[in-house]
Amino acid sequence: MLRRDFLKYSVALGVASALPLWSRAAFAAERPALPIPDLLTADASNRMQLIVKAGQSTFAGKNATTWGYNGNLLGPAVQLHKGKSVTVDIHNQLAEDTTLHWHGLEIPGIVDGGPQGIIPAGGTRTVTFTPQQRAATCWIHPHKHGKTGRQVAMGLAGLVLIEDDEIRKLRLPKQWGIDDVPVIIQDKRFSADGQIDYQLDIMTAAVGWFGDTLLTNGAIYPQHSAPKGWLRLRLLNGCNARSLNIAASDNRPLYVIASDGGLLAEPVKVTELPLLMGERFEVLVDISDGKAFDLVTLPVSQMGMAIAPFDKPHPVMRIQPLRITASGTLPDTLTTMPALPSLEGLTVRNLKLSMDPRLDMMGMQMLMKKYGAQAMSGMDHDSMNAHMQGGNMGHGEMDHGNMDHSGMNHGAMGNMNHGGKFDFHNANFINGQVFDMNKPMFAAQKGRHERWVISGVGDMMLHPFHIHGTQFRILSENGKAPAAHRTGWKDTVRVEGGISEVLVKFDHDAPKEHAYMAHCHLLEHEDTGMMLGFTV
């Protein structure tokens, strides 16, 4: 053995022995390099092209049909600039209709890309808009009603990077794909022949579609080699239904610098970072010690999501520091957050999220039959028992006093427990109603703050609630003050058996034909009715 090979081998053994057992097991296998999406920028005429297409990808040695934007799987990182208009031609080369939603962007309803913004098979849709919001990491994904879950599962997702003058002045890591790294995390389930195995059925309508394989930027357990110093990770939970809890395998801290809608006032130090479906957080991690480690997701208490291999810490990616050092820094302060306005006299909208108890019961039975007791591991047994006794349709906890009742179908709320043909495609509700594309639930006033009270009381399911056309502030989350890293600009809030309140404002028009959406971002809940439209 040559001396240099011996040294390299010794170093590798040293690195491997420093890692936990579940990580070391895979050390011998050659890991792929973390795929880095290309940056897509507008041309000289402020125009860009996105092509929605089918392709082929390889997972664990088997070829699978996948869908992507401008490629086989996922898509480019679309780069936008605050105050600069852009025109995007979206060409749909799939054999079915789709839409393209700009998740997190504050743009008019007509270009938002919700379920009304259909791009027919073989067709093209052109949108023009001017981002006026602060720098943020957002994303694109399809929003075809009833098909969103499947189209995302097939691979349609990509990042959107909004830049502004303020963030350019900060000395954050900003070398794309080197020390400024996108991390799109998704789980997949594959059939025996290697194809993506998506089903919308009673079980998935209840708990969501989840897989047993974790992909990071479309690759299984990849490695990223980065310069020593500060490493910036732009995290996106792109899963259909799985919440994540991100940590470093050696417990080194993560410094959260931005949430869905942009920079926090100052970095927030955490050792665990819960990440709901559709959420983005930007974190900085110090890798100046030169030691390799894994980014992992820790087990969560969400129903069905602690089934092996997710019953223990699961690697997302390996981070391998290089000998060279990068120049990015972690600033002490990042931006100035505006003070919250007075809540006196604001319009209050009460939204109640619920599930047809027949779907609830049958979905849970199917989950238990397929996976056994492990399906419920980590769950709170008291709330589970109350849930199993039919508690999830109670209405007593709703505050009717100052409620906007205009969109509520009381007949449906009273009757959905009884009789009627059961259709799991229409078995998830907001205020007792399934989504109706032709009937917006209410009209919000442009430029005025509103307080939205979103209740999941009586329902133990996790509902990451997403609102289009705005970046809001969380007033309370499941009855508690928001965690420090969740006090910034957000477009998604956790609703899980409790009540969450957000302060929203809409600065763009959304007419009936292109209403904004508000919905659960567990995609199978959204696809089976837990969504509403509203106008501005």
From Swiss-Prot:
<feature type="binding site" description="type 1 copper site">
    <location>
        <position position="463"/>
    </location>
    <ligand>
        <name>Cu cation 4</name>
    </ligand>
</feature>
<dbReference type="InterPro" id="IPR011707">
    <property type="entry name" value="Cu-oxidase-like_N"/>
</dbReference>
<dbReference type="InterPro" id="IPR045087">
    <property type="entry name" value="Cu-oxidase_fam"/>
</dbReference>
<feature type="binding site" description="type 3 copper site">
    <location>
        <position position="521"/>
    </location>
    <ligand>
        <name>Cu cation 2</name>
    </ligand>
</feature>
<dbReference type="InterPro" id="IPR008972">
    <property type="entry name" value="Cupredoxin"/>
</dbReference>
<feature type="binding site" description="type 2 copper site">
    <location>
        <position position="466"/>
    </location>
    <ligand>
        <name>Cu cation 1</name>
    </ligand>
</feature>
<feature type="domain" description="Plastocyanin-like 3">
    <location>
        <begin position="424"/>
        <end position="536"/>
    </location>
</feature>
<dbReference type="GO" id="GO:0005507">
    <property type="term" value="F:copper ion binding"/>
</dbReference>
<dbReference type="Pfam" id="PF07731">
    <property type="entry name" value="Cu-oxidase_2"/>
</dbReference>
<feature type="domain" description="Plastocyanin-like 2">
    <location>
        <begin position="229"/>
        <end position="295"/>
    </location>
</feature>
<comment type="similarity">
    <text>Belongs to the multicopper oxidase family.</text>
</comment>
<protein>
    <recommendedName>
        <fullName>Multicopper oxidase CueO</fullName>
        <ecNumber>1.16.3.4</ecNumber>
    </recommendedName>
</protein>
<dbReference type="InterPro" id="IPR006311">
    <property type="entry name" value="TAT_signal"/>
</dbReference>
<dbReference type="InterPro" id="IPR002355">
    <property type="entry name" value="Cu_oxidase_Cu_BS"/>
</dbReference>
<feature type="binding site" description="type 1 copper site">
    <location>
        <position position="520"/>
    </location>
    <ligand>
        <name>Cu cation 4</name>
    </ligand>
</feature>
<feature type="signal peptide" description="Tat-type signal">
    <location>
        <begin position="1"/>
        <end position="28"/>
    </location>
</feature>
<comment type="subunit">
    <text>Monomer.</text>
</comment>
<feature type="binding site" description="type 3 copper site">
    <location>
        <position position="141"/>
    </location>
    <ligand>
        <name>Cu cation 2</name>
    </ligand>
</feature>
<feature type="binding site" description="type 1 copper site">
    <location>
        <position position="525"/>
    </location>
    <ligand>
        <name>Cu cation 4</name>
    </ligand>
</feature>
<dbReference type="Pfam" id="PF07732">
    <property type="entry name" value="Cu-oxidase_3"/>
</dbReference>
<feature type="binding site" description="type 3 copper site">
    <location>
        <position position="519"/>
    </location>
    <ligand>
        <name>Cu cation 3</name>
    </ligand>
</feature>
<dbReference type="InterPro" id="IPR011706">
    <property type="entry name" value="Cu-oxidase_C"/>
</dbReference>
<feature type="binding site" description="type 3 copper site">
    <location>
        <position position="143"/>
    </location>
    <ligand>
        <name>Cu cation 3</name>
    </ligand>
</feature>
<keyword id="KW-0677">Repeat</keyword>
<keyword id="KW-0560">Oxidoreductase</keyword>
<feature type="domain" description="Plastocyanin-like 1">
    <location>
        <begin position="53"/>
        <end position="165"/>
    </location>
</feature>
<dbReference type="GO" id="GO:0042597">
    <property type="term" value="C:periplasmic space"/>
</dbReference>
<feature type="binding site" description="type 2 copper site">
    <location>
        <position position="101"/>
    </location>
    <ligand>
        <name>Cu cation 1</name>
    </ligand>
</feature>
<feature type="binding site" description="type 3 copper site">
    <location>
        <position position="468"/>
    </location>
    <ligand>
        <name>Cu cation 3</name>
    </ligand>
</feature>
<feature type="binding site" description="type 3 copper site">
    <location>
        <position position="103"/>
    </location>
    <ligand>
        <name>Cu cation 2</name>
    </ligand>
</feature>
<keyword id="KW-0574">Periplasm</keyword>
<keyword id="KW-0479">Metal-binding</keyword>
<keyword id="KW-0186">Copper</keyword>
<comment type="function">
    <text>Multicopper oxidase involved in copper homeostasis and copper tolerance under aerobic conditions. Is responsible for the oxidation of Cu(+) to the less harmful Cu(2+) in the periplasm, thereby preventing Cu(+) from entering the cytoplasm.</text>
</comment>
<keyword id="KW-0732">Signal</keyword>
<dbReference type="GO" id="GO:0016491">
    <property type="term" value="F:oxidoreductase activity"/>
</dbReference>
